[in-house]
């Protein structure tokens, strides 16, 4: 199974209309080049620590790009090579929320960012 298919499935699963699972993300932000941004993803309807949380992004006119995952139970992470040293994924189990922070922003980081269970 290739990653393209998996990413498409993960995004679809996160937004499925028939599921009680909800992932609610923070709103849109505008940042200057060189700044950092931290996106939150609050989970409900399932055991937060029982599933890895993935992050993907989609730049205008581009396909989906997998950024990495965090294990909410242990806090362990796995980042795509492109994002290593540049992205930080964390979680707060007390509020069932995952976070993705991207530093040293560039203009080509303009994208829609998704969390996906």
Swiss-Prot record:
Q: Which terms in the GO cellular component ontology are assigned? A: extracellular region; immunoglobulin complex; plasma membrane
Q: Where in the cell is it found?
A: Secreted; Cell membrane
**Which CDD domains does the annotation name?**
IgV_H
Swiss-Prot/TrEMBL keywords:
Adaptive immunity, Cell membrane, Disulfide bond, Immunity, Immunoglobulin, Immunoglobulin domain, Membrane, Pyrrolidone carboxylic acid, Secreted, Signal
**Signal peptide span per the entry?**
1-19
Q: Which domain of life is it from?
A: Eukaryota
- Disulfide connectivity for this sequence is 41-115
Q: Where would you say this protein principally sits, based on its record?
A: secreted
Q: Where is this region: Framework-2?
A: 53-69
Species in which this protein is naturally found: Homo sapiens
Pyrrolidone carboxylic acid: residues carrying this PTM = 20
Cite the effect that the entry attributes to residue 89 to S: In IMGT allele IGHV1-2*01; requires 2 nucleotide substitutions
Any idea what this protein is called? Immunoglobulin heavy variable 1-2
Q: What is the lineage of its organism?
A: Eukaryota, Metazoa, Chordata, Craniata, Vertebrata
Q: Name one Pfam family in it.
A: V-set
According to the record's subunit comment, the protein's assembly and interactions are: Immunoglobulins are composed of two identical heavy chains and two identical light chains; disulfide-linked.
Positions of the UniProt region annotated as Complementarity-determining-2: 70-77
